[in-house]
């Protein structure tokens, strides 16, 4: 079965289309179930017991419980790496990453990539690269991508290539490579071909990386238009924290007086957002330095 359109919609943030496409299928395999349940989680529409008679569905139920309680023990005890599928390992590795156990998350991904040929290995690669970059291990992320491409040679399908290209774009963004060339064009093409909140924010990130203030402001105006803010209200709500974070960066670049107000909005909406947490950490460190050298 060809999953290309489903994966393209998922990774471009077109979640409603993902569910519509999956509903049209006459079968339900682990790949369809994985993307269906991931989409329901993203839309905050997940309900326990949706597919609990299926092992992967059961694992997602445990993952959902973990997201509510932050107690990972039940999920961790029910997944045995030796027998788990790549999709099941993906769920556990995601929980490890959220739990701050980045080394274990990466180890789980690597185990799944190296020991399975079942569907879901490329998804594990993408997650592994995201985790490695989050942990500041850029060289490991690049090595994993290179090894995967070399090992697959001509066996990479179009849907695999979709995830490989996305992984490569993350590495380039993290290392400031091809910011004005291939990586920029990648996000620009995505935003034009699949005009969603996620793709527009991705392109805005590239503009902010280059300090293209006018272009970044143009995307803010686009996302605040009726087409995005009203007709795509569900996505607008979902991506609001990311939008606010980008607006904060833009406000800092322009020297706007709105910075503090935007930070307050983001903190109220998502107090655990990385930008807010890093800002608090830096403020604490600064206060400690001041106190240390205060006469």
Regions found by a protein language model. Name each.
Residues 16, 86, 94-96, 101-109, ...:
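Sequence/structural signature of beta-propeller domains
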Residues 1-72, 239-240, 258, 263-295:
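N-terminal alpha-helical scaffold/docking segments in eukaryotic complex subunits
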Residues 173-295:
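Structured C-terminal portions of repeat-based eukaryotic scaffold domains
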Residues 16-24, 45-55, 70-82, 102-114, ...:
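Alpha-helical repeat scaffolds
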Residues 9, 40, 65, 96, ...:
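Residue at a conserved register position within TPR or TPR-like alpha-solenoid repeats
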Residues 112-171, 178-182:
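Solenoidal tandem-repeat scaffolds enriched in leucines and small polar residues
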């Amino acid at each position: 079965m060809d999953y290309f359109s489903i994966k393209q919609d998922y990774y471009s943030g077109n979640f409603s289309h993902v569910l519509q496409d999956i509903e049209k299928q006459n079968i339900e395999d682990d790949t369809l179930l994985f993307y269906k349940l991931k989409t329901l989680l993203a839309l905050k529409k997940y309900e326990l017991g949706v597919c609990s008679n299926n092992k992967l569905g059961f694992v997602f139920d445990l993952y959902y419980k973990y997201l509510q309680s932050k107690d990972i023990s039940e999920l961790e005890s029910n997944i045995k790496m030796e027998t788990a599928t790549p999709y099941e390992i993906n769920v556990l590795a995601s929980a490890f990453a959220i739990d701050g156990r980045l080394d274990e998350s990466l180890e789980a991904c690597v185990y799944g990539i190296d020991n399975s040929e079942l569907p879901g290995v490329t998804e594990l690669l993408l997650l592994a690269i995201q985790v490695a970059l989050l942990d500041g291990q850029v060289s490991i992320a690049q090595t994993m991508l290179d090894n995967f491409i070399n090992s697959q040679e001509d066996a990479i399908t179009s849907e695999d290539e979709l995830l490989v290209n996305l992984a490569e774009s993350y590495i380039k963004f993290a290392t400031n490579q091809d910011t004005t060339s291939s990586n920029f064009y990648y996000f620009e093409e995505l935003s034009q071909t699949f005009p969603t909140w996620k793709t527009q924010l991705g392109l805005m990130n590239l503009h902010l990386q280059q300090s293209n203030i006018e272009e970044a402001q143009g995307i803010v105006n686009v996302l605040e238009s009726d087409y995005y803010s009203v007709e795509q209200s569900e996505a607008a709500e979902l991506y609001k924290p990311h939008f606010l974070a980008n607006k904060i960066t833009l406000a800092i670049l322009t020297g706007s007086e709105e910075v503090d107000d935007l930070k307050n909005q983001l903190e109220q909406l998502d107090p655990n957002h990385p930008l807010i947490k890093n800002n608090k950490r830096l403020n604490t460190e600064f206060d400690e330095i001041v106190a240390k050298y205060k006469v």
